[in-house]
Regions:
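Conserved FAD/dinucleotide-binding core of flavoprotein oxidoreductases
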Residues: 2, 6, 34-36, 88-124
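Glycine-rich phosphate/pyrophosphate-binding beta-alpha loops
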Residues: 28-30, 79-82, 167, 187-197
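Mid-domain catalytic core of redox enzymes
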Residues: 1-87, 226
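Active-site-proximal substrate-binding core of FAD-dependent oxidoreductases
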Residues: 210-231
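Flavin-binding catalytic cores
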Residues: 38-39, 67, 88, 109-149
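Short glycine/proline-enriched loop/turn "hinge" motifs that connect secondary-structure elements
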Residues: 82-91, 173-178
Length: 231
């Protein structure tokens, strides 16, 4: 929702302020790809953590750079939770997500830098025992500057305001805006990111809409003896 100010003509119109750079959540470098894998069967969702979290987040938050060994989320889109692939699938579809600074409004990733990010991710996966065969691999990247172009004013931040401190969720915008008929829901609105929180956000938006548009349903017209039609 941080893009609303840029998309609607300013924060005064929507009532949602853009988030300052230091208060943004993380962005990401993502790769939608198809490739063969070996080593062990992936489940539908897998996270390959860096063995040096302190160094990773020092790079992301202080040095504003990509970490050398990135924690890599892999969604194996063709697999079920038991790691089974449908019969006949050779190269499986995957989505890689690597954390990145939300600096898409001030920095553009070159083709070389994007390729280095993929190489670092593949090297990390290999060290964890998963080999992604690069022969015949096809991929499509999305970088923070691309996310910023899709959602102006965000720097590419994917989760709205950073969740620092116990009051962070209360600083996120609520469901209502100043624009009639526009309600906010999702991970960047109150109460915050993650499927359970986003579900609550959707429920709050639905409740707000119902309250704002509540009306008494008229009774069905009828005629009673000795009286008059009622509505």
């Amino acid at each position: 929702v941080s893009a609303l100010a840029a998309l609607t003509g300013g924060p005064e119109k929507a009532g949602v302020e853009p988030i300052r750079r230091g208060e943004r959540s993380l962005s990401a470098v993502t790769f939608a790809l198809t490739a063969r894998t070996s080593g062990f069967p992936l489940t539908h969702h897998s996270v390959f953590f860096s063995d040096d979290y302190a160094s990773e987040f020092d790079a992301l938050t202080r040095r504003r750079s990509m970490p050398a060994v990135p924690t890599t989320y892999v969604c194996a889109q063709d697999r079920d939770d038991l790691g089974h692939l449908p019969a006949g699938v050779d190269r499986e579809r995957m989505l890689f997500i690597l954390n990145a600074p939300a600096d898409g409004d001030t920095r553009t990733f070159s083709t070389k830098e994007t390729g280095e990010c993929l190489t670092q991710a593949l090297t990390h996966l290999s060290a964890c025992g998963l080999t992604v065969d690069q022969a015949g691999m096809e991929f499509s990247p999305t970088t923070p500057d691309r996310f910023h172009r899709l959602f102006p004013g965000t720097g590419g931040a994917l989760y709205g305001r950073a969740t620092h401190g116990w009051t962070a969720s209360f600083r996120r915008p609520g469901a209502r805006t100043r624009i009639p008929g526009l309600y906010l829901a999702g991970g960047s609105a109150h109460p915050g990111p993650g499927v359970p929180m986003a579900t609550l956000s959707g429920m709050l938006a639905a409740e707000s809409l119902a309250e704002d548009h509540a009306s008494t349903r008229p009774s069905r017209r009828t005629v009673i003896s000795g009286g008059m039609s009622t509505a």
